[in-house]
Amino acid sequence: DGQWALRSPYDGSVQQTIPARNLWIRLLTARIETGEPYIVYIDTVNRQIPQHHKLAGLKVKTSNLCSEITLPTGIDNEGNQRTAVCCLSSLNLDTYDQWKDDPQFVEDVMRFLDNVMTDFINRAPDEFAHAKYSAMRERSVGLGVMGLHSYFQQKNIPFGSVMSKVW
């Protein structure tokens, strides 16, 4: 129920003070109505940061828009600036039956993502030096899925049904 200082991202100066509860309610209302903003508890992220990032003296300061990627940025233990880079892709579950029995499929997709990272490292202009350095050090890639609802519709499986939960 205390006051919350709204600070300038440029100089940290307090621009306005408002009731913290009011701010929290506005955030939650916007989240319910629009799906945004995404909320990241950065202190928790940094407490759980992988050991090799801790040893490099790195911290996560931000994430991508949807908050599924939290990679460290800043100056590492070798004195080099890092700009986080991650190559993401999604498998479309609408086409799951076409690739589900191929034991090599996911490995091939991951190799493709790594090849995209190599291509970025080789082709990025000098202005992207910090991103190239980070890409070379981390080679961060991510693979997710999309189209679950479409797949269930194809198979006449009601969303939320027992069948959808055991699939």
Predicted stretch roles:
Residues 158-161:
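Glycine-rich phosphate/pyrophosphate-binding loops
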Residues 31-135, 140, 145-155:
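Function-dense linear segments that define catalytic or interfacial modules
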Residues 165-167:
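Glycine-rich and small/hydrophobic secondary-structure elements
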Residues 1-34, 42:
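Polar, glycine-rich mid-to-C-terminal structural blocks
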